[in-house]
């Protein structure tokens, strides 16, 4: 299966850049940083190249969201560490970056009968309540992802830890629908 069958929409990753941060110092030094501990315990900071957003916590942990690929996550976290160092905040060398979640989209290029899919996939693996939500929610054990299936043939894959997890999730759906004669 070609890598182009999915489009990564969002990568969420976390790391620990320091033992602790003084978020008021970072807020005062980083243009556009937002910190209001009465509303949220972390500082929010957005960057534009590559586009991503950070949640920075006093514990030294950083969550990066909004990146479109794993390489961009590494780039923006590296840039964040350099920026922190430039204002006198020492960061850890080579921090371990953990991808928490990847959201991807795909298109099967066909109209789908979600009622038939719900019956075919078995009610123990799916949630389908069209009055509540127009998509069918399909939980896959291997890879451990959730695939939202829409009657338009569009899919949203969430919960992947790698782009390959998302690719495999789409392939599982494609094979199962094909086996049921629903593609």
Swiss-Prot record:
HAMAP family recorded: TATA_bind_prot_arch
Keyword vocabulary terms for this entry: DNA-binding, Repeat, Transcription, Transcription regulation
InterPro entries hit by this protein: TBP (IPR000814), TBP_archaea (IPR033711), TBP_CS (IPR030491), TBP_dom_sf (IPR012295)
Family matches, as Pfam families: TBP
Function: General factor that plays a role in the activation of archaeal genes transcribed by RNA polymerase. Binds specifically to the TATA box promoter element which lies close to the position of transcription initiation.
Annotated S-S bridges: none
PROSITE patterns, alphabetized: TFIID (PS00351)
Family affiliation: Belongs to the TBP family.
GO biological process entries: DNA-templated transcription initiation
Sequence repeats: 8-84, 99-177
GO molecular function, one term: general transcription initiation factor activity
This protein's record includes keyword Glycosyltransferase: no
Lineage: superkingdom: Archaea
Claim: tRNA processing is one of the keywords in the record: no
Transmembrane segments: none
Protein name per its UniProtKB record: TATA-box-binding protein 1
